[in-house]
């Protein structure tokens, strides 16, 4: 069967295993071909081809429900649910999302993008089913490190305690599937999933419990013997862990053996209890470049299929690279510096630091809340912790930031990567709410560099800082030093940089928007409008003195952040509180979730390109002249 002919999962239910193997090869070819052009999450999807096929053959979607944790491994699911024709638009502006999207298909029952949420969502779906007297199956596919997140264990504890019927598929792609271990564990699994074995276990357990005196001791002896034998083949005795939480454990299963997967899933369908199916898969399976470097192809830019090398490489280092290099230089002379990541050493750039200072590098897993409070403990103990995290993931640690860092005024530095619009990953990954969460919090210092050089300057300043501090920077690197060299005077918080004079209007830009504001000023100059240009690098505290001096002309604020609660709203509140009646125009992100697409496309969509902002400023100035 051709992949392009699949309209729904029903189309693959009657295929032979030979036909299914051919279909798996087609899917892998499509994944590699499309992602090589569009970018995206390749390694994880290559690893779940057979698993996703088995799920759709055994269960009846969309009546049965599946929640994909993180959601980045849902590409195969999309291809099997009639979306082949639009798959070529993956992650493009107006095209298919790289994550499950309820508006995209009835098969996408729950939207995900951040880790460790699937079990809680699936439990909610299962309880909704039970409360309404329905009988369909609810599955959660979780893996790729998401089990390091605390939410998973909260959900497991709740589901096991309530004995809610649901199926958790643990996609374990950290273990290799050695033939001998795989064969032995598969043999044990075959025994355990057979209906006869399951029934026999129940009968034996019931019979032993009825025997006077010797019944319970015999039960304990047999249980001990079973666990001893199983522990030889099941690594780290996962069975006991999940059983203790109230789940029936199956596995480990070879995640690339379609027959074994279907056999197991057919069996667990019959159980009226919470179940964990432990599946072993190999990231990047079927494409050698991704198999050899799975982390490199976890989330990849467009690449050449033949070599696996990126199609386009930037000429500038990333903000993460500059951050890590600067932090490493600082650590050479300061033994108190500690770097922290939440399972993203490569994405944040901290792999560089880890190679040089392994004892001072801490990867806490997908546990942002824990990371912040642990950093607070480090600071209370006399260390200087730096937590590098994507701005969108930092949202999870809002309470810890207030309660554990800012209230005691501890010296924790947050390095907020991907602040602003991140591009093709879309709404779940845009870092556009961090300022709104941090600006109201006492003791917090918030900085936003205009370019790579200013990031270096701010990083070095933090060595002398004793307050909670956040430095936010975008995904796309900027270097403005050719036109605007770094100032000679030392960096100080509460001071802005007046980059250009101008009496007609003042442009106040934050971080990544400084580059856009420079172009706006140039366009205004061509129209005879002279604009002051200000780099508002110290977002909190603001440069109140300079702001008061600029308030004798219209004020325009520019930020790659939501308008509500952002920099512009704080400027407006300050001017109002001081009784300064300067007309204001604020540019930022409106009250909407921004879709996926290239940053330049999204800026245009939001009216934040230099040309569109200039038009609005000119109109506003003309309207102001009429009053």
Protein language model features and the residues they cover:
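Glycine-/acidic-rich phosphate or pyrophosphate-binding loops and their flanking alpha/beta elements
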Residues: 263-266, 298-299, 308, 318-333, ...
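Structural signature of the thiamine diphosphate
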Residues: 216, 220-289, 411-416, 435-484, ...
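Peripheral docking tails and interdomain loops at the edges
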Residues: 302-306, 310-313, 423-425, 434, ...
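Long, well-ordered, tryptophan-enriched scaffold segments
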Residues: 3, 174-323
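N-terminal amphipathic, basic-rich helices that act as targeting or association modules
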Residues: 1-79, 243-247, 254-261, 278-279
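Non-catalytic terminal/interface segments that mediate subunit docking, oligomerization
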Residues: 65, 281-395, 400-410, 467, ...
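Generic long, charged, amphipathic alpha-helical segments
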Residues: 363, 521-550
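Cofactor-binding active-site loop characterized by glycine-rich and histidine/acidic residues
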Residues: 41-162, 337, 341-342, 350-351
């Amino acid at each position: 069967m051709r992949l392009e002919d699949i309209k729904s999962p029903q189309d693959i239910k009657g295929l032979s295993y030979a036909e299914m193997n051919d279909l798996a090869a087609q899917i892998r070819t499509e994944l590699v071909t499309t992602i090589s052009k569009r970018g995206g999450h390749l390694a994880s999807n290559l690893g779940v081809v057979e698993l996703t096929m088995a799920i759709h053959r055994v269960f009846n979607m969309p009546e049965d429900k599946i929640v994909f944790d993180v959601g980045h491994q849902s590409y195969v699911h999309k291809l099997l649910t009639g979306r082949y024709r639009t798959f070529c638009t993956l992650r493009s502006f107006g095209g298919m999302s790289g994550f499950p999207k309820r508006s995209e298909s009835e098969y996408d029952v729950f939207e995900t993008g951040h880790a460790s949420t699937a079990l809680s969502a699936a439990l909610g779906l299962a309880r909704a089913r039970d409360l309404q007297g329905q009988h369909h199956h609810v599955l959660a596919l979780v893996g790729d490190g998401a089990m390091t997140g605390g939410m998973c264990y909260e959900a497991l504890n709740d589901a096991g305690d309530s004995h809610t019927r649901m199926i958790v598929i643990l996609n374990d792609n950290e273990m290799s599937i050695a033939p001998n271990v795989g064969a032995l564990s598969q043999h044990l699994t075959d025994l355990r999933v057979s209906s006869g074995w399951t029934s026999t276990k129940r009968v034996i357990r019931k019979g032993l419990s009825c025997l006077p005196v010797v019944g319970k001791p015999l039960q304990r002896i047999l249980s001990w013997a079973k666990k001893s034998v199983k522990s030889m083949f099941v690594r780290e005795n996962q069975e006991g862990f999940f059983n203790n939480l109230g789940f029936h454990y199956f596995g480990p299963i070879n995640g690339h053996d379609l027959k074994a997967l279907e056999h197991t899933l057919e069996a667990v369908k019959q159980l009226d209890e919470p179940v964990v199916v432990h599946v072993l898969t190999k990231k990047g399976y079927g494409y050698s470049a991704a198999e050899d470097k799975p982390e490199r192809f976890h989330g990849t830019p467009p690449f050449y299929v033949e070599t696996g090398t990126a199609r386009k490489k930037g000429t500038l280092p990333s903000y993460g690279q500059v951050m890590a290099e600067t932090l490493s230089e600082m650590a050479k002379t300061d033994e108190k510096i500690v770097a922290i990541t939440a399972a993203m050493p490569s994405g944040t750039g901290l792999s560089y630091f880890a190679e040089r200072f392994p004892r001072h590098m801490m990867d806490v897993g997908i546990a942002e809340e824990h990371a912040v409070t642990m950093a607070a403990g480090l600071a209370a103990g006399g260390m200087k912790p730096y937590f590098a995290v994507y701005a969108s993931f930092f949202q999870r640690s809002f309470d810890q930031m207030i309660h554990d860092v800012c209230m005691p005024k501890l010296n924790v530095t947050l390095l907020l990567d991907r602040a602003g619009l991140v591009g093709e990953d879309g709404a779940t990954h845009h870092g556009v709410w961090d300022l709104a969460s941090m600006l109201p919090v006492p003791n917090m210092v918030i900085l936003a560099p205009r370019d790579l050089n200013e990031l270096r300057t701010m990083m070095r300043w933090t060595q002398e800082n004793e307050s909670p501090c956040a430095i936010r920077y975008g995904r796309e690197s900027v270097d403005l030093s050719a036109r605007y060299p770094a100032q000679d005077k030392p960096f100080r918080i509460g001071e802005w940089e007046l980059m250009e004079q101008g009496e007609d209007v003042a442009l106040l830009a934050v971080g990544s928007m400084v580059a856009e504001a420079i172009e706006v000023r140039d366009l205004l100059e061509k129209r005879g409008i002279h604009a002051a240009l200000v780099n508002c690098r110290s977002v909190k505290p603001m440069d109140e003195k300079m702001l008061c001096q600029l308030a004798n002309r219209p004020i325009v604020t520019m930020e790659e952040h939501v308008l509500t609660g952002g920099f512009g709203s704080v400027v407006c509140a300050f001017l109002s509180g001081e009784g300064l009646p300067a007309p204001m125009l604020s540019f930022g992100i409106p009250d909407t979730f921004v879709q996926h697409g290239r940053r330049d496309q999204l800026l245009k969509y939001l009216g934040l390109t230099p040309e569109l902002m200039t038009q609005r400023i000119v109109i506003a100035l003309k309207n102001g002249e009429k009053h």
